[in-house]
């Protein structure tokens, strides 16, 4: 037995006290939770301990049965009698030091309490053991090696002298749907726990886990009891933060949690186990600075926020699991497993186990993480892990946990029914046909649609009938019976899968060599309860193979046992049932053999004996059906790629030994007829009963079957439309499942609604799929930001001012082509264009051309331009406004149509220039643009019906009224032509919108939009982050 941890320091502090004339040396040990004293005759008031416990030291394990009360530091505290103490007479633990308010000052070798200072004495030694309540059993062969490992890795264990560190490689964040603060009123603190709360807050502040807060967020707190007792026998307590409102706004972190069954199943050949529990696990993860305010809580008049990851957050377990997975990634599955803050180390022999412990502890030290000493269990041949007892023999239920089920009172409300089923379901792997047994109790939770309702009020009273009471008692009795030990799987050996199906449920037992590995079961859904017996039996096999895929994938041999002999025909090649054919194909993928085992039930106690089993043989295929060519079939009944489920009248045909007809109504408007026929005459007679001449009738069967009676079908139903469907897909009736399927398909590649519908129809069907797909696409934030808007929303065109004479309103811009720049101007009245070459876009280079334009049009009142920096410079705006009295109107950024007059001219100008270049009149860019401008001004404009150069001529003033009338008419025609497809939008202050990004910035993978908040609605534009954005640039 090894029962010591080494401090690794040479001087240990102690104090001396007198007891009835005897001097006691009392060790100050902040790592010990309780106080201990050696039994001496001077002790008085010795009394028995209410709950005896074991203490281990270097001298062996000792059971603590007695205690006494002693006054130390002016504080009365219990001391437990321990006769294995040698170097010291007593040990003073942390409980007494904390309660008495003792402050240690090791630098000055003193301590202080209640204003009294006392000198410390020191005991010099190379190393001293301390008492621990864990009984550590270590084989003699590795005792020294294990001791050296613990000394070398002692930093992995938390001590009260050290503030709890944190992992520097991980930063936790709290992503919420918005930044609106969550505030909840504080709960009143009970007076009886006020001191505990204050001490807890002080300790958290001291350790740097929390800090004072001024956050607008607030979550309330309360105190709950937790396992164990303190030195006085009182229940331990825990301070809990109620983060429920914050959790409602938190975006889920979809990090996959480990599968508990798979962890337990993979502990196969291990003989030794060690379990580690990380000290205040979540508090060892650093919380991002910008999210700390969200964790604010108030207690006893103070307000604080967490600097580390707190307990109770929605994503806390996912964040911590990811962190531990990163720390132990190279070891997980090989020497250890991790489930949140519970680590189990497993090995096949003693020396490997010491080495594995050393490896894991080193990884934790490297990650700056600490393990709780009190909860560590070393070198166990049987240990509790995740609510199960694991050992070299297998897995069994934890008696302590099962005891809670055995003593559970009969539920009297929905809440207690849910609680009992949840508790019992945790151990369903130990109960064969759990779903069938629990079915009467589960039915209590079903709503009107036959499905278990999550929204049923938990306060609804419940009174068990006799059937439900029997099911309740049976579950308790099974768990109270002798433990069933689940065997670890050996993946080199064959697996035996025993399945069974009843009218209400299906179940399976996976085993090897007669010993169960796991047991699974579930109740049948409403449509599945209508399956034929052979379909239910086959469903049990298919479901079990899928559910146990982690065990069976890649297995060399799988033997399937069933008690239903007619399954022989169900798995035969000649069976034409499409569903059964799909299931058989799935079974064939698993290299499985199906065997028939006589008997009404397959119990685990039967040891799944394989003696006297008859392998199922396929029956010889009949040649009765006449096979016609697919070509002839095409001329009679058209084959469609649509699944059968899409049609209002659905007929599924299959040849069988016995005639059978079943009618189903799906989605209130669709009829499905399942017909098993033996001969053609009976089939035609039955078809007359189910065929609907008013709609298209869909038929699903294989081509040879349809070919055998297609001519009779046409002859008997000459005016009826038929379609042959190749596929039948799964009907989805649950609305939430429909949304989940469409959303999952859309999120796969974010394609359009029609593509999503086609993809979903390959496997599923439900009505109104199109509208749901369009809704999902329309509400997809990713699509909004990443996709081009093929049908952008545009504001209605409004009436803009119409000039009355030439030069009253002009539009200017800078046109660039072939690395040449031109200042362009177009008169809104005459459409006359002016183009001036410029060297650059700077103020210096555009000022002179602007003055030339003003010289040509001396009566300019308004200049329209875009957001070119030079146009908006102080120099240019001051010159136009102050010197010439000209108003400047700027178009909203990234909305060229607001300056459409000149933008449209640029298109025409480039078009004329390209034509001139092809005519080889010149290759000089400047000359081409200037010549194109001349030709433009000489061409009749489509709106004014005049040549611009003639309208500018002084002699054209008499035609001004006529030209203005044409401008007004053109504007009205444009409004009438465009506005029917446009709609004005109004935005509220604070409304979130998507703003189109500048295409010239970023690359092809840059998001096309960013989400922003509206500050003000300006009519045709909105104000966002202090800048004007035209509504056409919003999605």
Curated annotation (Swiss-Prot):
Annotated catalysed reactions: DNA(n) + a 2'-deoxyribonucleoside 5'-triphosphate = DNA(n+1) + diphosphate
Record Gene3D superfamilies: 1.10.340.70, 3.30.70.270, Acid Proteases, HIV Type 1 Reverse Transcriptase, subunit A, domain 1, Ribonuclease H-like superfamily/Ribonuclease H
Keyword terms, alphabetized: Endonuclease, Hydrolase, Nuclease, Nucleotidyltransferase, RNA-directed DNA polymerase, Transferase, Transposable element
A Gene Ontology biological process term: DNA integration
EC numbers on record: 2.7.7.49
PROSITE patterns given in the database record: INTEGRASE, RT_POL
Domain Integrase catalytic: 797-956
Domain of life of the organism encoding this protein: Eukaryota
Alphabetized InterPro entries for the sequence: DNA/RNA_pol_sf (IPR043502), Integrase_cat-core (IPR001584), Integrase_H2C2 (IPR041588), Peptidase_aspartic_dom_sf (IPR021109), Retrovirus_Pol_polyprotein (IPR050951), Rev_trsase/Diguanyl_cyclase (IPR043128), RNaseH-like_sf (IPR012337), RNaseH_sf (IPR036397)
GO molecular function: endonuclease activity; nucleic acid binding; RNA-directed DNA polymerase activity
Top-level EC class: transferase
GO cellular component, one term: DNA polymerase complex
Reverse transcriptase domain sequence ranges: 205-390
Transferase keyword on record: yes
Family matches, as Pfam families: Integrase_H2C2, RT_RNaseH, RVT_1
Coiled coil: none
Protein's name according to its UniProt entry: Retrovirus-related Pol polyprotein from transposon gypsy
Organism for this UniProt entry: Drosophila melanogaster
Gene name linked to the record: pol
């Amino acid at each position: 037995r090894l029962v010591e941890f080494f401090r690794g320091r040479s001087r240990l502090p102690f104090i001396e006290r007198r007891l009835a004339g005897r001097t006691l040396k009392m060790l100050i040990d902040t790592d010990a939770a309780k106080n201990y004293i050696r039994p001496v005759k001077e002790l008085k008031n010795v009394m028995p301990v209410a709950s005896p416990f074991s203490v281990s030291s270097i001298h062996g394990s000792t059971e603590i049965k007695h205690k006494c009360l002693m006054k130390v530091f002016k504080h009365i505290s219990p001391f437990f009698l321990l006769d294995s103490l040698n170097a010291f007479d007593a040990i003073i633990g942390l409980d007494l030091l904390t309660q008495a308010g003792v402050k240690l000052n090791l630098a000055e070798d003193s301590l202080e309490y209640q204003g009294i200072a006392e000198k410390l004495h020191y005991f010099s030694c190379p190393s001293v053991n301390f008492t621990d309540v864990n009984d550590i059993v270590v084989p003699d062969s590795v005792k020294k090696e294990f001791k050296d490992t613990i000394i070398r890795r002692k930093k992995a264990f938390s001590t009260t002298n050290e503030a709890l560190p944190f992992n520097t490689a991980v930063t936790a964040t709290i992503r919420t749907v918005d930044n609106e603060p969550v505030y909840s009123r504080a709960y009143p603190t009970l007076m009886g726990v006020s001191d505990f709360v204050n001490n807890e807050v002080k300790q958290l502040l001291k350790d740097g886990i929390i800090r004072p807060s001024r956050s607008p967020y607030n979550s309330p707190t309360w105190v709950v009891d937790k396992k164990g007792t303190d030195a006085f026998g009182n229940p331990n307590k825990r301070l809990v933060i109620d983060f429920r409102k914050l959790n409602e706004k938190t975006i889920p972190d979809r990090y996959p949690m480990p599968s508990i069954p798979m962890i337990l199943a993979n502990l196969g050949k291990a003989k030794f186990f060690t379990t580690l529990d990380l000290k205040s696990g979540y508090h060892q993860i650093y919380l991002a600075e910008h999210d700390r305010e969200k964790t604010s809580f108030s207690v006893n008049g103070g307000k604080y926020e967490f600097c580390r990851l707190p307990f109770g957050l929605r994503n806390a377990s996912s964040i911590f699991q990811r962190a531990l997975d990163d720390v132990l990634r190279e070891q997980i599955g090989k020497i250890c497993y991790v489930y949140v803050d519970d680590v189990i180390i497993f090995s096949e022999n003693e020396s490997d186990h010491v080495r594995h412990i050393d490896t894991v502890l080193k990884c934790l030290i490297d990650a700056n993480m600490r393990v709780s000493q009190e909860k560590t269990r070393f070198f166990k041949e049987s240990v509790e892990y995740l609510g199960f007892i694991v050992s070299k023999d297998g897995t069994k239920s934890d008696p302590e946990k099962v005891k809670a089920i055995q003593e559970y009172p009969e539920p009297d409300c929905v809440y207690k029914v849910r609680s009992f089923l949840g508790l019992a379901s945790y151990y369903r792997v130990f109960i064969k046909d759990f779903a069938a047994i629990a079915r009467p109790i589960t039915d209590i939770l079903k709503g009107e649609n036959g499905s278990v309702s999550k929204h049923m009020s938990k306060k609804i009273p419940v009174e068990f009938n006799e059937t439900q009471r029997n099911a309740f008692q049976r579950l308790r009795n099974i768990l109270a019976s002798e433990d069933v030990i689940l065997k670890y799987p050996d993946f080199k050996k064959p697996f035996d899968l025993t399945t069974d199906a009843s009218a209400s449920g299906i179940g399976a037992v996976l085993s090897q060599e007669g010993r169960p590995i796991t047991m699974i079961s579930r109740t049948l859904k409403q449509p599945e309860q209508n399956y034929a017996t052979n379909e239910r039996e086959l469903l049990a096999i298919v479901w079990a193979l899928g559910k146990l895929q982690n065990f069976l994938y890649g297995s060399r041999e799988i033997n399937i046992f069933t008690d239903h002999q007619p399954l022989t025909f169900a798995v035969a090649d000649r069976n034409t049932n499409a569903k059964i054919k799909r299931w058989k194909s799935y079974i064939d993928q698993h290299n499985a053999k199906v065997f028939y085992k006589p008997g009404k039930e397959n119990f685990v106690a039967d040891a799944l004996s394989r003696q006297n089993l008859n392998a199922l043989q396929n029956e010889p295929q009949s040649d009765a059906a006449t096979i016609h060519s697919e070509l002839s079939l095409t001329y009679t009944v058209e084959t469609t790629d649509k699944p059968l489920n899409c049609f209002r009248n659905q007929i599924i045909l299959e040849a069988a030994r016995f005639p059978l007809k079943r009618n189903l109504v799906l989605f209130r408007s669709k009829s499905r007829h399942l017909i098993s026929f033996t001969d053609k005459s009976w089939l035609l007679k039955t078809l007359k009963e189910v065929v609907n001449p008013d709609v298209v009738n869909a038929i699903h069967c294989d081509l040879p079957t349809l070919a055998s009676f297609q001519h009779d079908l046409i002859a008997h139903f000459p005016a009826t439309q038929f379609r042959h469907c190749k596929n039948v897909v799964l009907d989805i009736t649950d609305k939430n499942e429909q949304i989940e399927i469409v959303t999952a398909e859309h999120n796969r590649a974010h394609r359009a609604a029609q593509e999503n519908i086609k993809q979903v129809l390959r496997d599923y069907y439900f009505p109104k799929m199109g509208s749901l797909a369009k809704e999902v696409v329309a509400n997809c934030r990713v699509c909004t930001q990443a996709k081009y808007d093929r049908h952008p929303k545009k504001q209605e065109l409004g009436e803009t001012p119409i000039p009355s004479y030439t030069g009253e309103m002009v539009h200017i811009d800078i046109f660039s082509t072939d690395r040449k720049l031109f200042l362009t101007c177009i008169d809104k009245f005459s459409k006359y264009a002016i183009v001036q070459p410029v060297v650059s876009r700077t103020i210096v280079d555009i000022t002179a051309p602007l003055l030339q334009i003003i010289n040509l049009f001396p009566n300019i009142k308004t200049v329209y331009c875009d957001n070119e920096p030079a146009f908006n410079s102080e120099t240019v705006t001051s010159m136009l406004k102050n010197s010439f009295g000209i108003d400047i109107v700027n178009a909203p950024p990234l909305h060229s149509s607001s300056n459409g007059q000149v933008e449209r001219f640029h298109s025409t100008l480039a078009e004329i220039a390209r034509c001139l270049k092809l005519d080889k009149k010149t290759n000089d860019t400047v000359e081409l643009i200037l010549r194109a401008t001349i030709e433009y001004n000489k061409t009749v404009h489509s709106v004014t019906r005049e040549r611009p150069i003639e309208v500018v001529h002084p002699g054209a003033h008499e035609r001004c009224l006529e030209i203005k009338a044409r401008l007004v008419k053109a504007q009205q025609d444009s409004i009438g032509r465009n506005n029917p497809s446009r709609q004005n939008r109004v935005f509220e202050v604070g409304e979130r919108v998507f703003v189109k990004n500048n295409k010239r910035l970023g690359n092809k993978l840059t998001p096309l939009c960013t989400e922003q908040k509206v500050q003000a609605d300006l009519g045709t534009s909105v104000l966002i982050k202090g800048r004007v954005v035209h509504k056409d640039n919003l999605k």
